[in-house]
Amino acid sequence: MEVKIHSKHIDANLKTAMHAMCGYALSRLGISTRLSNNINLNIHMRHAEHEGESYIHDDANSKRPRDFVVVLDHHQMNRDEYGRKLTDTEWGHKILETLGHELVHVKQYLTGELTGGAEAGLYWKGTRFKLEDFRDYFETPYEIEARGRERGLLIGFLVQWNDMQPALDEYLKNN
């Protein structure tokens, strides 16, 4: 898997965690090593309409996509649902959780469950979902799965991350 993170002013430790989260999440979502070795993820940290979005890269094969773009608007992630400012650690966790959510959509594209795009419309297992308003978005099967998996992916990742963090810190200190 090739992961490119395009960002400014993002801590190296968070970037490393984002790389690790990509591998962890796709593995937990049942994507084989063989398939994940052929995936390209371009993660852009920039202003966007939503906190996160993922889509098939314009140049990718739409029938068997392997190139994906994930956009994370980290500027929108500095406050919780109630408007409280997040600490740096909470902000990093929010970024990783949103990345996990978007990687569920990548899995859906890879397995053919989710097809189409913004212009053609999104299809879940062959059924087109026409959204009348934003409330309908949260009722789509692809969003229900992504919302349902995002927290579990974050917690599972953080358990592994905390276990390997001392060894990683030692490695970075010596190299």
Mark where each language-model region is.
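Active-site recognition of the HExxH zinc-binding catalytic motif
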Residues: 97-110, 146
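Active-site scaffold of zinc-dependent metalloenzymes
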Residues: 48-94, 106-110
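Long, well-structured alpha-helical subdomains associated
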Residues: 132-175
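Post-HEXXH active-site segment of zinc metalloproteases
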Residues: 93-97, 109-139
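Substrate-binding/catalytic groove segments of enzymes
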Residues: 106-122, 154-165
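Auxiliary, metal-adjacent structural segments of Zn-dependent hydrolase domains
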Residues: 2-69
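Hydrophobic (often cysteine-bearing) scaffold residues that line and stabilize catalytic clefts
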Residues: 14, 18, 92, 96, ...
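Short alpha-helical scaffold segments that flank and stabilize functional sites
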Residues: 25-28, 107, 149, 153
